[in-house]
Amino acid sequence: MSTLSLCIATYRRPERLAAVLLDLTQQTRLPDEVVVVDNDAGESARPVVEARLKAGAPYAIRYAVQPQKNISLTRNKTVELATGNWLAFIDDDERAPLPWLAQLMDAAVRYKADGVLGPVNPVVPPNAPGWIRRGHFYEFPRMNSGSVIPPNRLRFGNVLVKASWLHRSAAPFDPSLGLTGGEDGDLLARLQQQGARIVWCDEAVVNEPVEPARLSLQWLLARALRGGQDFARHALVGRYGEMNELQRVNFFLTALCQAMAATGLALVALPLGRHHAARWLTTVSANIGKLSVLWGWRYREYA
């Protein structure tokens, strides 16, 4: 019989954490346990977990603190504590519709998968600027259910993984990426290279309310820059396939050309709407992120 652990790494989001813990009590396929690892040395998540236990929870809850500011170490602690033979992961700012876990588990069986990813649906507040709502900046491409996911689209936030794959290493998430991010895609790309079959389930949606702090061009450019750095680092170490020296040179020349072209297109697009210009500016930022790997600079999103 399959057992399911639900893993949450959290950092100073008590209200959001309380909401997702409530969602998990209402799942049509309940988790056997929920593992909450608090990355806040002040233990801000502890009262939330205790309140959930007091109110009643149809699953066991394991709570631990990982005080060092590092998302990789925090996620590694969830894997260490989880006892299920399947591990599902959800972010502490996401909401889980009732059939979510059942859909992930059903997809794992139906497609004979070692891992299943689902969509994260951004919920943009109605008072967001018009150009933000028109730009669809927080959405990611979706695929047909059962499709094997390309390595450059692998990420956490809504994922189910067979525990045996994660337990192959004492530290499945790379601690060196714990302040910059990108540790999730790096891990799944490595598992895929080792033979794990990771597929998409388009029905297993979670919702992510977009926080007010993210409703700005500054945030969009910073996230694009980090995404470009992640992509370049993963590409250069062979996560997307081996690269020879000529391919490496071409990679960076392409990034330079794309950054220059997108700069011009952003200026041309501005009269057509701020959202069009912003889209091209995120392309500029992503390619600058790729180029910045050449001089070793890292944007530390979680520092």
Label the model's feature ranges.
Residues A222-R226, Y240-A303:
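Non-catalytic, C-terminal membrane-associated alpha-helical segments of glycosyltransferases
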Residues Q66-A82:
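Glycine-rich, basic loop-to-helix element that forms the pyrophosphate-binding segment
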Residues P99-W131:
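Conserved donor NDP-sugar-binding/catalytic core segment of glycosyltransferases
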Residues M1-Q26:
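N-proximal low-complexity "stem/linker" segments adjacent to membrane-targeting elements
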Residues G178-A189:
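Acidic donor-binding loop at a coil-to-helix junction in glycosyltransferase catalytic cores
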Residues L87:
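Short aromatic/hydrophobic "clamp" motif used to bind/position activated sugar donors
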Residues G118-P119, R133-N152:
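Short, flexible, basic/aromatic active-site loop/helix in glycosyltransferases
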Residues L21-V65:
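Acidic donor-binding segment of Leloir-type glycosyltransferases
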